């Protein structure tokens, strides 16, 4: 079902920080930069590789796609600039090449899967995102462009990077968000835990009746960095032991005082390695339980021990603890997320609820955006002419779980729907039907049936709890999904082969 729970990951801040080197507030989790990263020297011109030559300019093959050495070198140059701006010591060139190529391989896998699912991002959506980035950072689009170009990134490259970020965001929503189910029992247990744990409660203050789910009086926020030593799926006991030893050696270096960000950039297998390992900031209850427990007694500025998960061995650094609204750490990625469950200001919460229904047509390899929009336009014409009923059309055409109920979404609170859907819904008067509207789930026709004012204090608390539990799972679930995608793909890493050959020849 398309409503209510969706990842709060946002592309705008990460790209702005990447392009401008701005110290924005930290993002909620592991947002990846848009453009490539580090700079390294080009490998020696040519060396035989058992019949193939590295001189062909191919760094890797991912399924049927080629990643060229030029792409790696361009990414390396950008990464060197970015790392210097962040004050992070540059790894060796060969390490930077390896890190950049790994990022490019994951990016290519994401792009291929998005293409397979029919996820497209048009120029209008990119322009809308640029306007959002500029607005959030108190810039005009023209000023944003000037800053981007002043920092050495062409405007075309910036738009291309932003397009990729949007597509990845939509891919995450399409593949993960709909498959995470939070039960009422889990919400009940979460709220009980909140009540028992004073550290997770907002500051005491009576708030007046308000017209929206207001920002909290200060949820406890936690900013984390990570160094990940990845363990491949199906690794042998000897391989696992060797990788644990690698994690132990890294931890020993950190205990001796080595800079966490520099070690992360050189040694981490995590997607945020080239950002110095910075994963972001969230309400403390938005992090996976495994991480929260591991750093429960770790003061700001210190590192945890080694934590083992299904992905490998993690070492975490507590970058900051504090209330929402406190100054964020210097290394940044994106706008501060909205407070999570249990964080609503105390006192009654009055909202305008909307009773709505919709028809959803999903895009795919066989259903393009244009085809989906045209089909809904035809349905809308029938509805406007009175030759068909909305509920009948929903049962016949809608691909949402609400189709058997005639597309009825019930009463919807502000903030429950994805932004494009909510904006279209809010623009309608009762009885009106929207034009086709696009969301990460596909294309919709929306009809508003009625509106009402309601005290939703308890509902809002449960909704926020559900969202917090969802956020705990969404990030790790996407990482697991990407690992499975990688395991199923054909990947010929020629840089890695070249490195092994050179080591054997020494």
From Swiss-Prot:
For this UniProt record, give its keywords in alphabetical order, as a comma-separated list: Chaperone, Isomerase, Periplasm, Repeat, Rotamase, Signal
Indicate whether S-adenosyl-L-methionine appears among the record's keywords: no
**Cystine pairings recorded for this chain:** none
In terms of SUPFAM superfamilies, this protein maps to: FKBP-like, Triger factor/SurA peptide-binding domain-like
Q: Where in the cell is it found?
A: Periplasm
Q: What GO terms fall under cellular component here?
A: outer membrane-bounded periplasmic space
Is Cytoplasm one of the keywords?
Answer: no
Q: Principal place where this protein is found?
A: periplasm
User: What name does this protein carry?
Assistant: Chaperone SurA
- Which organism does this record belong to? Bordetella avium (strain 197N)
| Highest classification ranks of the organism | Bacteria, Pseudomonadati, Pseudomonadota, Betaproteobacteria, Burkholderiales
What is this protein's gene name? surA
